[in-house]
Protein backbone atom coordinates (compact mmCIF):
# COMPACT_ATOMS: atom_id res chain seq x y z
CA UNK A 1 0.00 0.00 0.00
CA UNK A 2 1.36 3.42 -0.95
CA UNK A 3 2.02 6.01 1.71
CA UNK A 4 0.26 9.36 1.76
CA UNK A 5 2.12 11.82 -0.41
CA UNK A 6 2.93 15.44 0.30
CA UNK A 7 0.98 16.58 -2.76
CA UNK A 8 -2.02 18.84 -2.48
CA UNK A 9 -4.77 19.37 -5.08
CA UNK A 10 -5.09 23.00 -6.15
CA UNK A 11 -7.12 25.06 -8.58
CA UNK A 12 -5.49 27.53 -10.99
CA UNK A 13 -7.93 30.41 -11.65
CA UNK A 14 -7.66 32.74 -14.66
CA UNK A 15 -6.86 36.39 -13.95
CA UNK A 16 -8.86 37.38 -17.07
CA UNK A 17 -12.06 37.09 -14.96
CA UNK A 18 -13.62 34.53 -17.34
CA UNK A 19 -14.29 31.93 -14.65
CA UNK A 20 -12.06 29.35 -16.36
CA UNK A 21 -9.77 27.23 -14.19
CA UNK A 22 -7.39 24.27 -14.33
CA UNK A 23 -6.85 21.69 -11.58
CA UNK A 24 -3.45 20.28 -10.72
CA UNK A 25 -1.35 19.10 -7.80
CA UNK A 26 1.73 20.56 -6.18
CA UNK A 27 4.22 19.41 -3.58
CA UNK A 28 3.64 21.73 -0.62
CA UNK A 29 6.96 20.81 1.01
CA UNK A 30 9.18 21.86 -1.91
CA UNK A 31 6.96 24.75 -3.09
CA UNK A 32 5.23 26.41 -0.10
CA UNK A 33 4.55 29.70 -1.94
CA UNK A 34 1.47 30.24 -4.12
CA UNK A 35 1.78 29.04 -7.71
CA UNK A 36 1.42 31.44 -10.63
CA UNK A 37 1.73 30.26 -14.23
CA UNK A 38 0.86 31.49 -17.73
CA UNK A 39 -1.55 29.18 -19.57
CA UNK A 40 -4.11 29.42 -22.39
CA UNK A 41 -7.60 30.65 -21.48
CA UNK A 42 -10.04 29.30 -24.11
CA UNK A 43 -12.79 31.75 -23.12
CA UNK A 44 -10.49 34.78 -23.54
CA UNK A 45 -8.71 33.08 -26.49
CA UNK A 46 -5.26 34.14 -25.29
CA UNK A 47 -2.53 33.24 -22.82
CA UNK A 48 -3.12 34.75 -19.39
CA UNK A 49 -1.74 34.34 -15.89
CA UNK A 50 -3.38 31.74 -13.66
CA UNK A 51 -3.10 32.02 -9.88
CA UNK A 52 -3.50 29.34 -7.26
CA UNK A 53 -6.73 29.00 -5.28
CA UNK A 54 -7.96 26.38 -2.83
CA UNK A 55 -9.85 23.45 -4.33
CA UNK A 56 -13.02 22.90 -2.30
From Swiss-Prot:
GO CC aspect terms: cytosolic large ribosomal subunit
GO MF, one example: structural constituent of ribosome
InterPro entries: Ribosomal_bL33 (IPR001705), Ribosomal_bL33_CS (IPR018264), Ribosomal_bL33_sf (IPR038584), Ribosomal_zn-bd (IPR011332)
Alphabetized Pfam families for the sequence: Ribosomal_L33
GO biological process: one example: translation
Keyword annotations of the record: Ribonucleoprotein, Ribosomal protein
Gene3D superfamilies: Ribosomal protein L33
NCBIfam families named in the record: PRK00595.1, rpmG_bact
Similarity remark: Belongs to the bacterial ribosomal protein bL33 family.
Matching HAMAP family: Ribosomal_bL33
Protein name, as recorded: Large ribosomal subunit protein bL33
High-level lineage: Bacteria, Pseudomonadati, Pseudomonadota, Betaproteobacteria, Burkholderiales
Amino acid sequence: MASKGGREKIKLVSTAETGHFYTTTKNKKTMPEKMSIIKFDPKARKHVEYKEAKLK
